[in-house]
Amino acid sequence: MTERKREHKDRKQNKNSPKNQSKVTKFLKWFFIGILLLGITAVTVVGIYVLSIIRSSPELDVQAIQSLNQPSILYDDQGNFMDNVITREQRYVVKSEEIPDNLKKAFVAIEDERFYEHKGIDIKRIFGVIASNIKGKLSGSNTVQGASTITQQLIKNAVLTNEVSYERKIKEMYLALELEKHLSKDEILTTYLNTIPMGGYQYGVSAAAQRFFSKNVSDLNLVECAYLGGLTQAPTSYDGLSEANKENPSRYLNRTKSVLFKMHELGYISSEQYNDAINEIDTNGIKFTPNNKLSKTNFEWFTRPAITQVKQDLMDKYKYTQEEVDKLIANGGLKIYTSMDRNLQNNVQKVLDDPNNYKAITNNPNEKNEDGVYKLQASATIIDYKTGHVKALVGGRGEQPAMSHNRAYYDLKSIGSATKPLTVYGPAIDLGLGGAGSVVNDSPLSNKELSSTGYKDQPKNEYNSYRGPLTFREAIKISSNLAAIKVANEVGVSNSIAYGEKLGLVYGPHSRGISTTALGQFQNDPNNPDGGNTYTLASAFGVFGNNGVKTNAKLYTKVLDSHGNVILDTSTPEETKIFSPQASYIVYDMLKDQVESGSAKSAKFGNIPVAGKTGTTTGDKDYLFAGLTPYYSAAIWIGYDKPREMRTSSGTVTSPIFGKIMGLAHKDLQYKEVDNLVE
């Protein structure tokens, strides 16, 4: 044996020696111990993480989950029923016995076939989905399956949000297990079928049955049940009413067949039922009878703004998200007590509807569009300015479809000379720049004034002349534009806008000049709506009867949750000081002149003191009147949604309407003056 071979043999023997074998064993031992410790640590960390998520889960309120049959309700100022809340979400809650067995079986078959066996989560399905998704990743497929049970989906729809995260999924699984301890399978399934999104604004099988088939859910046949059962996985993709699916219905037809196949496989329907249903689809397809009719509330003009305001106040007070507050309003069983005076609301509507009130407008005031809606429109708002409670709010003239444009609350327009008390004379007097007897010259602007006001051409008065020196009282009575421009120039644009914004007016980026602050000519860019409306103006003019204090206008008095707890209350007014008591009373007294002996004489009624101001926008396209009494403030707007000339004057049309609606509001009220007069 050579020396090299002997050395090789010795090394081989040393490797196999007991000493070396002991080292390998020790290494493997500690290696596996390390792996085990890492595994234990990982499991512990994951366990702590999961436990922390579970502890942060919202409390399971079984009653809230099942409270879908408690729609939010609105009441008038006497506590009488007014309206059910109707949102864009269409939902008609049905009881278990109204839901066909075939519809229940269709959903269980395609969504959760072991629904009646598991306790809230389907372990077998979870591992199956994990394996399938891993296989899909390895094969390059992008298909990802879900493992949510019907119970989990109910938790997601009723309690959690649609956020995609591990945290949300863990909460969902935990709450599903908890829910199964409190409700029977049928209770869970029924609640699920009342909450499931079914495409568009439809939630629940009853709304879907109405939308697709114009049927009560109890009248659905087997094919219709199978279609709805398959719809929920991808409502848009399987929507039989979409234009794409009308041209090529194979997608939703095949999905419906898949549901029927699964129902047959699980023994929910017989072979004969299955074959008949498949033949029906192959022969006739699925016959849809769409029903897209929107529900209309009893007091459309008042109800929708009240809901909007309640939603915003809930978000401000409780930091709800938009999604959360929408769910609460739609399904939370709230009781919303509005400030609406039912009789006054109805009577104001009648006055605005009456064609006789528009005879002075020669531009065909009773012309209607293709939907039968008057082209000439009107809106009005009446407010108790001491409490801020809105007593009547009408957003349009004549019968109009549901969800029509509310011109009193949501619209913003130029307000014309109605701005003069708010952003010209009120601020001037409040800032000590003048009083009712102070003189301003109604004359053309000097070159210096043209330069400082930004006007290129000489502005004009509506009466096409100049009156020379006028007191503030005279200038506002005849609505001198030149006088207003000069006073507004002294006040300063920034000061005027500051007053206007506190009073509720909205100034866009292109409406921050003297023509806006002095004459109320807002640019009203469609991308930046600005100006005011009757809701804004009625609230703003109430300042002059309330010692210069603006009380935030509210359309409701209180809101109760489904358990009767008060969650919003407006009994304590939200107040903002705008003018001094002295300034506000001087303006109030000045505004009485236009009603007593000016262009708004028709606004007067009975022996109640009335103060107010007309408003006209460029080209006679908007007519307004805003004013107040010692009891209420109100505002009227008349115009076209697509502005056009009306060929008369604001005082001729708006003042009589103001007098009529305020006369109704003051029925049986006695003479008095505004409170706390400043001598």
From Swiss-Prot:
Residues 72-244 are annotated as: Transglycosylase. Pfam families: Transgly (PF00912), Transpeptidase (PF00905). It is found in: Cell membrane. Residues 1-14 have a biased composition (Basic residues). InterPro entries: Beta-lactam/transpept-like, Glyco_trans_51, Glycosyltr_51/Transpeptidase, Lysozyme-like_dom_sf, PBP_transglycosylase, PCN-bd_Tpept. GO terms for cellular component: outer membrane-bounded periplasmic space; plasma membrane. Residues 378-663 are annotated as: Transpeptidase. It catalyses: [GlcNAc-(1->4)-Mur2Ac(oyl-L-Ala-gamma-D-Glu-L-Lys-D-Ala-D-Ala)](n)-di-trans,octa-cis-undecaprenyl diphosphate + beta-D-GlcNAc-(1->4)-Mur2Ac(oyl-L-Ala-gamma-D-Glu-L-Lys-D-Ala-D-Ala)-di-trans,octa-cis-undecaprenyl diphosphate = [GlcNAc-(1->4)-Mur2Ac(oyl-L-Ala-gamma-D-Glu-L-Lys-D-Ala-D-Ala)](n+1)-di-trans,octa-cis-undecaprenyl diphosphate + di-trans,octa-cis-undecaprenyl diphosphate + H(+); Preferential cleavage: (Ac)2-L-Lys-D-Ala-|-D-Ala. Also transpeptidation of peptidyl-alanyl moieties that are N-acyl substituents of D-alanine. Residues 52-679 are extracellular. Residues 1-30 are cytoplasmic. Its main location: membrane. Its EC number is 2.4.99.28, 3.4.16.4. SUPFAM superfamilies: beta-lactamase/transpeptidase-like, Lysozyme-like. Keywords: Antibiotic resistance, Carboxypeptidase, Cell membrane, Cell shape, Cell wall biogenesis/degradation, Glycosyltransferase, Hydrolase, Membrane, Multifunctional enzyme, Peptidoglycan synthesis, Protease, Signal-anchor, Transferase, Transmembrane, Transmembrane helix. One of its GO terms (molecular function) is peptidoglycan glycosyltransferase activity. The active site is at 111 (proton donor), 417 (acyl-ester intermediate). One of its GO terms (biological process) is proteolysis. In the N-terminal section; belongs to the glycosyltransferase 51 family. In the C-terminal section; belongs to the transpeptidase family. Cell wall formation. Synthesis of cross-linked peptidoglycan from the lipid intermediates. The enzyme has a penicillin-insensitive transglycosylase N-terminal domain (formation of linear glycan strands) and a penicillin-sensitive transpeptidase C-terminal domain (cross-linking of the peptide subunits). This is Penicillin-binding protein 1A. It comes from Clostridium perfringens (strain 13 / Type A). The lineage of its organism: Bacteria, Bacillati, Bacillota, Clostridia, Eubacteriales. The gene is pbpA.
